[in-house]
A protein has these predicted regions:
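Class I SAM-dependent methyltransferase SAM/SAH-binding core
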Residues: 65-112
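Conserved class I S-adenosyl-L-methionine
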Residues: 1-50, 55-64
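A short acidic, Gly/Pro-enriched loop at the edge of an enzyme's catalytic core
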Residues: 114-124
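A short glycine-rich, Lys/Arg-flanked "PGG" loop and its adjoining helix->strand segment in the class I
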Residues: 137-149
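Core SAM-dependent methyltransferase catalytic element
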Residues: 189-205
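Conserved beta-strand signature within the Rossmann-like core of class I S-adenosyl-L-methionine
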Residues: 150-158
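A short SAM/SAH-binding and catalytic strip from SAM-dependent methyltransferases
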Residues: 123-136
């Protein structure tokens, strides 16, 4: 069955969702160490934790190798996260961190694949998912649907592919009030140099 991802940059660059998965399976361990070394996960945790109860229940969309789980635990989060990712290799690495309770292999944009998680989370987080790979306007509504009223969402976007006025408009339409914005540069390495803007927002009660 055709996936919405097939029409995004993922589909254009790799030909299919299966090819995207294969690419991330191939460089998973290298990616894990490169992203941790960039300092971006620690920056996300510093920006997010002031808005969270340490016992909050959260979900990590596009969790990859679990770098955000590690960073949030280091910053004082007590609870294990749930996580979703397309790559089995990445999910295996995330499991090894010991920071995740449940891990699900799923395509975020495929109807029904993420239905195993209840829409009751205190917070959700995503970094590296929205931007060049998955357009924010496709991903953000799915992510917001997993949150309870009043929950916190931390989401990073690649600014070069995400118009700020359009992102802010969609955030408001989804009931998100932006609380903070942090710039997170990623130096060139396994990935080309890029700049993430990390937003912390609260979903209307």
């Amino acid at each position: 069955m055709k996936s919405p991802l097939d029409d995004t940059i993922w589909g254009a660059a790799y030909g299919s969702v299966a090819a995207v998965q294969a690419a991330f399976d191939r460089f998973g361990p290298e990616y894990h160490h490169a992203i941790l070394a960039s300092g971006a996960p620690a920056g996300v945790a510093r920006a997010l934790m002031p808005h969270l109860n340490p016992d909050a229940q959260g979900i990590d969309f596009g969790c990859g190798s679990g770098v955000l789980g590690l960073a949030l635990r280091e910053a004082g989060l007590h609870q294990l996260l749930d996580g979703i990712d397309l790559s089995p290799v990445m999910l295996g690495l995330a499991a090894q961190t010991g920071c995740y309770r449940h891990l699900l292999r799923a395509n975020l944009l495929a109807p029904g694949e993420c239905s195993g998680f209840p829409a009751l989370y205190d917070f959700a987080i995503t970094m590296g998912l929205m931007g060049d790979y998955v357009p924010y306007y496709l991903a953000l509504p799915h992510i917001v649907s997993a949150l309870r009223p009043g929950a916190i969402l931390g989401y990073a976007v690649e600014r070069r592919s995400t118009p700020s006025h359009a992102l802010e408009k969609l955030s408001a339409e989804l009931g998100l009030s932006i609380l903070s914005e942090t710039v997170l540069p990623i130096p060139a390495g396994i990935l080309e140099a890029q700049v993430y803007h990390f937003f912390v927002a609260r979903l209307d009660a």
